[in-house]
A protein has these predicted regions:
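N-terminal cysteine/histidine-rich coordination modules
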Residues: 5-19, 23
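Cysteine-cluster motifs in flexible loop/terminal segments that predominantly coordinate metals
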Residues: 42-75
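Helix-loop-strand module that forms the ligand-binding subsite of alpha/beta enzymes
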Residues: 62-147, 153
Length: 191
């Protein structure tokens, strides 16, 4: 089994990535392979609504010059998906929005290849907005009929400066429990 996480923060090794790594640690303890893909510092455009993916059904977006098709294939091949985003103006970052729009559209055009995969949201926030960010990611998982594991609270950390997550004991516990629950759900759904 393999989980691929997409870090939507432009900050490499920032709080969002550190939260993902906490989840990864628990997944690895359960023998689940992990891979981190940094998308937050990339320039992706959103879906343009051309419906070419519905015509071609070739598992690709017609926009082929920005690396999103490689990301879509990573999502298709993974058993579990983590999408991490800091809160930007009360919601997900632009690269995460583009991933959601384009992967979701290509998946649905190709028999919904995301169906029944396990999906988890990871968010980092300074003060407010994490519920919208968390919900935006989970709405994506829900509309694609994915299985969403829970934790002991919403999957968020209160943090601003890089490394602040290390001071957020409750947030770290949430991500530890998310990793344990994600591993359990994946094993149960793949029996």
């Amino acid at each position: 089994m393999k989980v691929v996480a997409f870090n939507g923060s432009p900050r490499v090794n920032g709080n969002t990535q550190q939260a993902i790594e906490i989840v990864f640690e628990e997944l690895r303890k359960e023998g689940i392979e992990t891979e981190l893909v940094q998308i937050g510092n990339k320039r992706f455009s959103g879906c343009i609504g051309c419906r070419k993916c519905q015509e071609t059904k070739d598992m690709k977006c017609i926009i082929s010059d920005d690396g999103m098709n490689e990301i879509i294939m990573k999502m298709k091949e993974a058993d579990g998906i983590i999408i991490g985003s800091p809160v930007y103006y009360g919601n997900i970052t632009v690269p995460v929005k583009a991933l959601i729009e384009r992967c979701g559209t290509v998946s649905r055009a190709n028999g919904n290849f995301m169906r029944r995969k396990t999906g988890a949201a990871v968010t980092s926030v300074r003060r407010a907005g994490s519920n919208f960010t968390y919900s935006a990611i989970n709405f994506f998982f829900g509309i694609l009929e994915m299985v969403i594991p829970s934790s002991t609270y919403w999957n968020m950390t209160l943090s601003m400066a890089p490394g602040d997550i290390q001071k957020d004991d409750e947030g770290k516990t949430v991500f530890v429990n998310l990793g344990k629950n994600m591993a359990w759900v994946m094993k149960k759904t793949m029996e």
